[in-house]
């Protein structure tokens, strides 16, 4: 949650989307080559950020069922002028590749083609400009997720409706309609304002959680106050309701990847990117991470969610049932998570593209 909160401060009026599990798995790869205080910082950060982080990055898709796909693209690119330790290369296996950074354009195309392949063509260009010829090592991270809704929205019900970017700015969106679905829902009143949480299941064992503030501009208060602990507490308050859901189709495509170096430094990982970086388990030379790039893509429509980021059967009596109507027509937060609570993606949607 902390990386996401740092990003939304830097991008207050933009759509933001990251994949925490992808970022953490990449940090785990780096940790294989870290020593001393660098290893201590990395180990502590990974432990504090996500207790469910897999020990091996290749296990990221263990809990993803046949009806969904999760493909991660995490890679360390190291200079071919450096002799890396065999023990390090054995640990990370396919997650490492040597390149000639002096041939900047070729290296750029190599990285972009790899990311395109790993994300099923949804992310075509992680790098929009060549890396510096002085680069010694670069970490890139991308992820692709696709899952079918457990309760698909009917395409013939989709209509054009208003979306309030702010109280004074209104645009239009394609609004999807899901009726009479039994979903996990709660409305919560906190000191900073009221909001609704709705858990929308996919086929299998993952779901999208929407946090929708009551106030059109209430997203800013949620951003300031949400924590991992509060999110878990709020989700524990969910209960089954009959819901009429009005949700916009939306797509988020990043034009530039996030460089997470300054954000991770702000969060305490100071001994990875600077003078005190110790990657002596990686190689004998002094080396530091110069870039940590992360990019994502998401497409939410009537049939499925696709990101280049379960529930049981509920029964009701045949009687008059009060249905809660949820209109997602202004900025909101969303998470895609699995049944363990592991957040695969977290984002903010505030500006239809």
Swiss-Prot record:
Protein known as: Serine proteinase inhibitor 1
Species of origin: Vaccinia virus (strain Copenhagen)
PROSITE patterns hit by this protein: SERPIN
Family indicated by similarity: Belongs to the serpin family. Poxviruses subfamily.
Keyword annotations of the record: Early protein, Host cytoplasm, Protease inhibitor, Serine protease inhibitor
Disulphide bridges, residue numbers: none
Location in the cell: Host cytoplasm
A GO term from the CC aspect: host cell cytoplasm
Gene designation per UniProt: OPG208
GO MF annotations, alphabetized: serine-type endopeptidase inhibitor activity
Chief location category: host cell
InterPro entries in the cross-refs: Serpin_CS, Serpin_dom, Serpin_fam, Serpin_sf, Serpin_sf_1, Serpin_sf_2
Site (Reactive bond): 318-319
Function: Plays a role in mediating viral host range. May act to inhibit a caspase independent form of apoptosis to allow efficient virus replication in infected cells.
SMART domains linked to this entry: SERPIN
Pfam families linked: Serpin
């Amino acid at each position: 949650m902390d990386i996401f909160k740092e990003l939304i401060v830097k991008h207050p009026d933009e759509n933001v989307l990251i994949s925490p599990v992808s970022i953490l798995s990449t940090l785990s790869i780096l940790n294989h080559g870290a020593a001393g205080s660098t290893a201590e910082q990395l180990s502590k950060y990974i432990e504090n950020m996500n207790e469910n982080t897999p020990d091996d990055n290749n296990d990221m898709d263990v809990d993803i069922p046949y009806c969904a796909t999760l493909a991660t693209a995490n890679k360390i690119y190291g200079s071919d002028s450096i002799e890396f330790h065999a023990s390090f290369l054995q640990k990370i296996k396919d997650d490492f590749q040597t390149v000639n950074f002096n041939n900047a354009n070729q290296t750029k195309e190599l990285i972009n083609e790899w990311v395109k392949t790993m994300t099923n063509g949804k992310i075509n260009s992680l790098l929009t400009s060549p890396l510096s010829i002085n680069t010694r090592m670069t970490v890139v991270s991308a992820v692709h997720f696709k899952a079918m809704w457990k309760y698909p929205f009917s395409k013939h019900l989709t209509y054009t409706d208003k979306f309030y970017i702010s109280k004074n700015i209104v645009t239009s969106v394609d609004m999807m309609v899901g009726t009479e679905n039994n979903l996990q829902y709660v409305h919560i009143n906190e000191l900073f304002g009221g909001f609704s949480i709705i858990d929308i299941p996919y086929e299998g064992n993952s779901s999208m959680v929407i946090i929708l503030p009551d106030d059109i501009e209430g997203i800013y208060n949620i951003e300031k106050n949400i924590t991992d602990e509060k999110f878990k507490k709020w989700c524990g308050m969910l209960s089954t309701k009959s819901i009429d859901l009005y949700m916009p189709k939306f797509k988020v495509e990043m034009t530039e990847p996030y460089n997470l170096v300054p954000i991770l430094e702000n969060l305490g990982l100071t001994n990875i990117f600077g003078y005190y970086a110790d990657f002596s388990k990686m190689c004998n030379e002094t080396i530091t991470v110069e870039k940590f790039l992360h990019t994502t893509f998401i497409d939410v429509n009537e049939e499925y969610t696709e990101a280049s980021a379960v529930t049981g059967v509920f029964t009701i009596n045949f009687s008059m049932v009060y249905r809660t109507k949820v209109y997602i027509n202004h900025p909101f937060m969303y998470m895609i998570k699995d049944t363990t609570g592991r957040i695969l993606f977290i984002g903010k949607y505030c500006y239809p593209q």
